Amino acid sequence: MNAAGGGSGAQAAAVAAGNNSLSHNALLSTASGATTMPMAQLADGWLELESDPGLFTLLLKDFGCHDVQVEEVYDLQKPIESPYGFIFLFRWIEERRARRKIVETTAEIFVKDEEAISSIFFAQQVVPNSCATHALLSVLLNCNENNLQLGDTLSRLKTHTKGMSPENKGLAIGNTPELACAHNSHAMPQARRRLERTGAGVSSCRFTGEAFHFVSFVPINGQLFELDGLKPYPMNHGGWEDSEDWTDKFRRVMAERLGIATGEQDIRFNLMAVVPDRRIAITHKLKMLRTNQAIVSGTLQKLLKADEQGESGNGDSQRPDTPTTLLEPSAFTARDLQSLLKNLDTEIAINEQHLADENDRRHMFKVDASRRTHNYDKFICTFLSMLAHQGVLGELVSQHLLPSKKVSGQGAANRISKQSTTASAGGSTAAGTASTPKTQQQQAAAAKNGKSPSKTPGRRRKGRNKCRKRK
């Protein structure tokens, strides 16, 4: 990925302009194993990808590497089984203070020896928007081939780029049609539209309007290397203790890195691990459990048969021993074997569920990929056109706009009503207060004439009648 004003911008521009295209095309057509496209088209055509483990897993499969998957890491302290490497995504801001601290720290561990650089796969990112593929290849092409089946495309790329400079390796990646097509097949339509509007001069690794960058951490010859395509050299973080795993060294390096980065209150990053396909280990374990289940079940049947023969007095009542492939050569009761068989059945059921869950995850990866890459523009435009043709679009728009107006109108009406009620209440109170002296004068005059104020039943009944009428 290119950061705004990043160091690889000039290189990417040179590639886009097709500089040295003839020599590189002639050199790399063999590496790709296919007829190369014009270099400018390949360099300009790489699209931005989201940081998603499902997307990366499917991308690895499209590269031809089938026995690998990518998982997101949420807890650094949680152990991870047999990782090939880690991919770290962070927001790239060149002038950020924390970024300068990281640069000052990593500059001391640059590996500048050309022979050492040529012995590993380290490629400079000279093609915009290719950082996701660069990060994956930096892990895969530095793994032991005995432990990982790379597939034809990656094997050819690794073979034919051996001994090349980091810049030429970056050009080899950008000029491999299989990699470019697989990469772009997982991009969102927005990424293509953005590329068409702005060109290839600006690069980021997620369609967020900001620059994000991937770097890889991988163990090579007992040393932890950090491979960043925007750096001029690979970085060697050193080895680890004999009693440690390489992931322990990685945790310490990453904890220090995150401590520097989060000092600026910026925690927008994520960490992914490249690991073996979990389904392979589960399938192998299921095979072993089913073999043991068959052995225990067969031994139990023989034991029960021997017990029956012993009780009937026919044949040899000697109990068979459990085969040495499962347990020590000693006699077991039928109850022991039944308990062991029950545990095996439980383990088999658990692992079958785990395998089903992994298969469901792969299915959801494909569903999410279809949703992510599908272009809904035509559907939305056609749908809105049909609504307009039927004359209901304006009504639907009004229905969605009017509620807000109604709410604001009702609020104003409520305020006016409240003010009117308050004014009426105030007027009534004032009127009542004003009539009080007049009522007192009438009562005083009645008392002077010898009449009791209470002897006015007609007026009181009239008031009560009015209340009844109101009811």
From Swiss-Prot:
Listed under catalytic activity are:
Thiol-dependent hydrolysis of ester, thioester, amide, peptide and isopeptide bonds formed by the C-terminal Gly of ubiquitin (a 76-residue protein attached to proteins as an intracellular targeting signal)
For the null mutant, the annotation states: Polycomb phenotype leading to lethality, probably due to misexpression of homeotic genes.
Cite the Gene3D superfamilies for this sequence: 1.20.58.860, Peptidase C12, ubiquitin carboxyl-terminal hydrolase
Q: Where is this region: Positively charged C-terminal tail required for binding nucleosomes?
A: 405-471
Described by its record, this protein's role is as follows:
Catalytic component of the polycomb repressive deubiquitinase (PR-DUB) complex, a complex that specifically mediates deubiquitination of histone H2A monoubiquitinated at 'Lys-119' (H2AK118ub1). Mediates bisymmetric organization of the PR-DUB complex and is involved in association with nucleosomes to mediate deubiquitination. Does not deubiquitinate monoubiquitinated histone H2B. Required to maintain the transcriptionally repressive state of homeotic genes throughout development. The PR-DUB complex has weak or no activity toward 'Lys-48'- and 'Lys-63'-linked polyubiquitin chains.
Family as reported in the entry's similarity comment: Belongs to the peptidase C12 family. BAP1 subfamily.
From the Swiss-Prot or TrEMBL record, give the protein name.
Ubiquitin carboxyl-terminal hydrolase calypso
Q: Which organism is the protein's source?
A: Drosophila melanogaster
